[in-house]
Amino acid sequence: MIVWSIANQKGGVGKTTTTVTLAGLISERKKRVLLVDTDPHASLSTYLNFDSEQLPASLFDLFQLQTVNKETVKPLIVKTQFENMDLIPAHMSLATLDRVMGNRGGMGLVLKKALDALADEYDYVLIDCPPILGVMMVNALAASHRVLIPVQTEFLAMKGLERMMRTLQIMQKSRSSNFNLTIIPTMYDKRTRASLETLQELKIRYSDQVWASAVPIDTKFRDASLKHMPASFYAKNCRGVFAYKTLLTYLERLEQDEQA
């Protein structure tokens, strides 16, 4: 089972779009994918047409379990309307988790334990991270084989990337192995100087970690979200979906190389 976290400490860079679109493409390849919404705003859950206030359980309940195993974790999972795609939804109560958990030991590995228990149930897990460093982001990163960092191709997004990289450096100190990172340029508009220069700067500063291509601006992403569908199901031939197909192939090759 491959676990990817989609993270950036700046909002509006395409985290949820990246998560849903990749999940749609993975499910179309007949692979089982579990989505985990760790953001109290529950954007991923809402995208997939779930109202977390109306659900019997959410990710928050994972942190209330006395024992974490397959039998206790599976009730937190909801099936989406799409084949091979399930979700552990978020709830606004996640915003209180840092205060509720306090300094309890081992809380940074709860999600990893839960996903380890589900290892034979899914081929991929995609974790949509919150924009702030706290218990949930720590859990997501600790559980991940790779961190995908969407970065809007504009100057301010570069600042957000710098903060994210500092966060990863801090967390690296408690890991025995380095984070595998892939920076994903998003919302690219080749007509604008800002996009052109930002993409160039990304490739110069993070040459070995940035995906060489970019996800273009595409209104089909917005239209797909209104229909609560992955863009690959809504407009499979649009340029944005084509970019994510190329990205997924690239990421799969990276995983294969690392396992070789």
Model features per residue range: what roles?
Residues 1-260:
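P-loop NTP-binding core
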